[in-house]
Amino acid sequence: MNTAITATTPTEYSYNDRYINRELSILDFHLRVLEQAVDPLHPLLERMNFLLIFSRNLDEFFEIRVAGVMEQFALGNESRSPDGLTPRQVLQKISETAHTAIERQYRILNEEILPKLREEDICFLRRGELTPAQSAWVKKYFQEQVAPVLTPISLDPAHPFPRLVNKSLNFIVTLEGKDAFGRQIDLAVVPAPRSLPRVVRLPDELTGGKEHHVMLSAIIHEHVSDLFPGMTATGCYQFRVTRNADLALNEDVEDLAKALKGELSSRRFGRAVRLEVTQNCPQHIYEYLLEEFDLNEEQLYKVDGPVNLARLVSNFKRPHLRYDSHTPVVPKVFKKTESIFSAMQKQDILLHHPFESFAPVIQLLREAARDPQVLAIKQTLYRSGADSEIVQVLAEAARNGKEVTAVIELRARFDEESNIEVANVLQEAGAVVVYGIVGYKTHAKMIMVVRRENNKLVRYVHLGTGNYHAMNARIYTDYGLMTTDKDLCEDVHRIFQELTGMGKMAKLKKLLHAPFTLHAQLINFIDEEIANAKAGRKAQIIVKVNALTEVQLINKLYEASQAGVQVDLIIRSICCLRPGLPNLSENIRVRSIVGRFLEHTRVYYFSNNGDARIYCSSADWMDRNLFNRVEACFPIEDPALKKRIYQQGLLNYLQDNQQAWLLQGDGTWIRAKPAEGEKLHNAQRELLETFK
């Protein structure tokens, strides 16, 4: 536990007193996710799912964030981050926290989740629990379904240690005896192909109708000797290596897509950053593996169970162990008219996903693709998937002769391969595909449809805080604005011109856009609140984003706090600001909401002396969003929509006392609890009730 931080003046706070380390802050978010696995607010199978989400999150954390810090350390970089820590110090703190977290993860799995699943007749059987009939079935399954695709690799001078794929399941086997060539083989490695299911369900006739499962790792472990005829397997131990998965791409290449394809293949074999082994792995074995992967014991993680929990997934048909089903509602405005275009002409339309349906966005594109009066469709795509309905509708529009322009961000992390496929699908259909601006990721969420009406060209625009991904729109909270506002439409048109053509920075009327005007305008908005507070007027700032790391904005918020501005921050993940510090940030409160849906909306609120400014945006308050990406930040001007966002999207979350976590000045997070007599308030449940 960190000690309390205090000073009599702002200047007395050192750097490490003013800021929280970014890497440690994101690790804290993953810990908040892990805590959902023991939260009785969630049904049992959803708690298990949070356990798996934690595994996936931690995998990416090591692949990207830890790998980056390790590179800095390897290069001898001793420069300190804003919080005052060197790369070496950061790695030490990550290791301490991650080891404790992973131990807790497996303790939750073994002591809470699995026993409770067993009470529901969902069992993950260990080898010693199988009946003779079940053992016979498993042996046959191994012989027919598993062994034919396994490739055991002996380790000797003729067979050096193999290159193993990032995050793949592997076994190291200790052997006695000689092989067919008379060689004395002591060790072998058996990689488990990703094509094999990690969980195998036993037939109902062998389980009395109960759901009994066996791990692939247990099946291989039990029958690994069959892979080495005439030899004896004296030990078999799971292990998994996590590698650096960040892409080092020279963006000055002539063909970005081609260069990306080459980098994607190398991602599978990047530098090792973590080794996971089972708890019973002998010291001489894991030391051998550490040497092969050039890792130290600080990077070794011993686990009490499968080394790849992220793939511990099975389709359990137990509705009572899941969340109640939720069907997103379609706003009434769309039910009163046959055409999306007619609805948008009447008013600005705000969509709040996943409580409201994503279908109107797809319907806008579908109508545009088939309407003979539509001339052009332009859209940005960051994450969508080649088989998504949106991509298929855009391809249909191109085939129907519409001028379709897609700005596809090929460098969206872990979606690069999918986005290359999206580009190919659209190009083959006849769409114009561009990859944005070299050096800047295109992260803005924009659609523009151009339609001929009464001999004039009319534009219809959708702006969003989240990706054009129908599946994510069912589990991520996001806002989308559908509008025909002429100024907003003209601004979107100009940003598309920036992305597809050449020329100077576009001068926009209403939109704020990164990397040009957004950061400076945010500073101006905060300065206005500071001036209002100093003049004795009401001053308040509410920001809801995924992350806050940008130092200038943090310092400006500190300045606002010292001036008396009330600052409320709803930060899902990373927050480098320290709230509640005397004479620095005592007027700043920070909370994080972790629940059924992943909080993804970006909303900025400035009270503006009673004439509130509310913006929705694709941008978090991070350096990369504000300076290295193309982002769109759009104002909400309709009074009814402003009221909706303020009440449902901000105040509702500030009142949450069930899913909220509160950041302390020492960098720790504590669970919000209702005060004595205070009514329980769950923000996401309130919205589910509101939009029934």
Curated annotation (Swiss-Prot):
Gene Ontology MF: a single term: polyphosphate kinase activity
GO annotation terms (biological process): polyphosphate biosynthetic process
Active site: H443
Ranges in coiled-coil conformation: none
Catalytic activities: [phosphate](n) + ATP = [phosphate](n+1) + ADP
Cofactor: Mg(2+)
CDD domains cross-referenced by the UniProt entry: PLDc_PaPPK1_C1_like, PLDc_PaPPK1_C2_like
Record PTM: An intermediate of this reaction is the autophosphorylated ppk in which a phosphate is covalently linked to a histidine residue through a N-P bond.
Role, per record: Catalyzes the reversible transfer of the terminal phosphate of ATP to form a long-chain polyphosphate (polyP).
Family label: Belongs to the polyphosphate kinase 1 (PPK1) family.
Name of the protein described by the UniProt record: Polyphosphate kinase
Organism: Acinetobacter baumannii (strain AYE)
